[in-house]
């Protein structure tokens, strides 16, 4: 066991899906995996291991934000030997051509957080995805006919920003969408020499103010999860 994960050694697969919501982790396990076993309920942050098309895979809730996902990613890699970490979540679109329910593959992640500035002595670091996972996910999406967009996303520390226009400068530089975890995930993957990728479903648009319904989010989320599950090795 690690501090925040109750699993024993060997109970977590080398490839893991990381939704922020622990109930979404439970949904993925119960609806997509076979022979599932729950290895974690610590703090209500569910973790499951099962199989998908004969390949062993795990799914673990991470909570919201860079500090929370950093805890789970550190322990999954250091204590359980996870090699492929795939975040599946939602985001807000920053570009006019991006529609609700589109799927985004995060090639890289900018951030307004000071986490990496503290780590790198005030200098910037460019967190990037695993090219191997990125290419494979894109190819799978093409095969399944799922429209995907690939590019930079913005990882933010605050969900409710007092400056409602702060996103516009990022959009000017081509940033596709905003979310809250990817920069931390990619930085830690680089530190430990493992592979990581974020897949995001567009749940709302900062351009139009449009939002998806819970049913629409669920239906689109399932397509994204099907892409992510194909990355199991």
Swiss-Prot record:
The record marks 217 as: Important for catalytic activity. Keywords: Glycosyltransferase, Transferase. One of its GO terms (cellular component) is cytosol. The active site is at residue 204. A purine D-ribonucleoside binds at residues 4, 162, 179-181, 203-204. One of its GO terms (biological process) is purine nucleoside catabolic process. Its EC number is 2.4.2.1. CDD domains: PNP_EcPNPI-like. It comes from the Bacteria. It catalyses: a purine D-ribonucleoside + phosphate = a purine nucleobase + alpha-D-ribose 1-phosphate; a purine 2'-deoxy-D-ribonucleoside + phosphate = a purine nucleobase + 2-deoxy-alpha-D-ribose 1-phosphate. GO terms for molecular function: purine-nucleoside phosphorylase activity. Phosphate binds at residues 20, 24, 43, 87-90. Gene3D superfamilies: Nucleoside phosphorylase domain (3.40.50.1580). Belongs to the PNP/UDP phosphorylase family. Catalyzes the reversible phosphorolytic breakdown of the N-glycosidic bond in the beta-(deoxy)ribonucleoside molecules, with the formation of the corresponding free purine bases and pentose-1-phosphate. HAMAP family: Pur_nucleosid_phosp. Homohexamer; trimer of homodimers. This is Purine nucleoside phosphorylase DeoD-type. It comes from Alkaliphilus metalliredigens (strain QYMF). The lineage of its organism: Bacteria, Bacillati, Bacillota, Clostridia, Peptostreptococcales. The gene is deoD.
């Amino acid at each position: 066991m690690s501090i925040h994960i109750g699993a024993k050694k060997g109970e977590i697969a080398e490839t893991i899906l990381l939704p922020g919501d622990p109930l979404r982790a439970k949904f993925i396990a119960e609806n997509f995996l076979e022979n599932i076993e729950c290895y974690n309920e610590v703090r209500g942050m569910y973790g499951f291991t099962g199989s998908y098309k004969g390949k062993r895979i795990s799914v673990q809730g991470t909570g919201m934000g860079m500090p929370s996902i950093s805890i789970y990613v550190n322990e999954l890699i250091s204590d359980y030997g996870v090699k492929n970490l795939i975040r599946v979540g939602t985001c807000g679109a920053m570009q006019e051509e991006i529609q609700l329910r589109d799927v985004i593959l995060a090639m890289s992640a900018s951030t307004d957080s000071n986490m990496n500035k503290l780590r790198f002595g005030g200098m910037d670091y460019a967190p990037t995805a695993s090219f191997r996972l990125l290419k494979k996910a894109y190819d799978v999406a093409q095969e399944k006919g799922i429209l995907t967009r690939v590019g930079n996303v913005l990882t933010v520390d605050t969900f409710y920003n007092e400056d409602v226009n702060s996103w516009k400068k990022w959009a000017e530089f081509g940033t596709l969408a905003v979310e809250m975890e990817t920069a931390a995930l990619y930085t830690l993957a680089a530190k430990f020499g493992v592979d990581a990728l974020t897949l995001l479903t567009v749940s709302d648009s900062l351009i139009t103010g449009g939002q998806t319904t819970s049913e629409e989010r669920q239906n689109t989320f399932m397509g994204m999860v099907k892409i992510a599950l194909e990355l199991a090795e």
